Amino acid sequence: MLLPNTNWFWYTHENELRLDLGDTLTFVAPFALKNLVNLPSDKQLFSLEDTEHYVALAESLDNSGLELSDGELVQILLNATAALKFHKPIGMKSWLYKTQSTSGVHYQLALLEPTDTAYPELGQVIVIEQDGACATCMLISNEFAVNSSKKFSKFEMIKVMNDRLIPCLVDIPVYKRA
């Protein structure tokens, strides 16, 4: 897995938020600039706080048992870190999802169930921030249709009430257990 280092820095170029990872590697965040705030006007170092978010989420996902390639994991980690640092607050969309009798998260992973029964697919999300009764999530499913007029894309941000979150329990292989 790619680990943060002191040479990484955020910047904007050609209407994109980017992270220079050194060695000619550049990460481009999937978020439109209109949805971001506090953008760097020049190079902005990947901070200690960014590193803490990145590493904490990496540990959580590793413990969850979710099977991801190194590339998928790094992409999720970088997108989540960028969202926490730069994404504008988003509006609640709880009415799109069913209230759950047993709700919560498991190692920051959760599922969302659309209220529209014509769309039975669950969307898998990572909870990147929780405050009070709400959760800000990032979709990690490839896409997620919740009704005939609304479809979310991978890495799109979704904010819901905590009672909409279904804990995503993944089988943990024996070799991952302590």
Curated annotation (Swiss-Prot):
GO biological process, one term: division septum assembly
A Gene Ontology cellular-component term: cytoplasm
Alphabetized Pfam families for the sequence: ZapC_C, ZapC_N
Annotated S-S bridges: none
Subcellular location(s) per record: Cytoplasm
InterPro entries per UniProt: ZapC, ZapC_C, ZapC_N
Highest taxon of the lineage: Bacteria
Keywords: Cell cycle, Cell division, Cytoplasm, Septation
Residues annotated as signal peptide: none
Main location: cytoplasm
Family named by the database record: Belongs to the ZapC family.
Function: Contributes to the efficiency of the cell division process by stabilizing the polymeric form of the cell division protein FtsZ. Acts by promoting interactions between FtsZ protofilaments and suppressing the GTPase activity of FtsZ.
Description of how the protein assembles with itself and partners: Interacts directly with FtsZ.
Protein name: Cell division protein ZapC
Gene name per UniProt: zapC
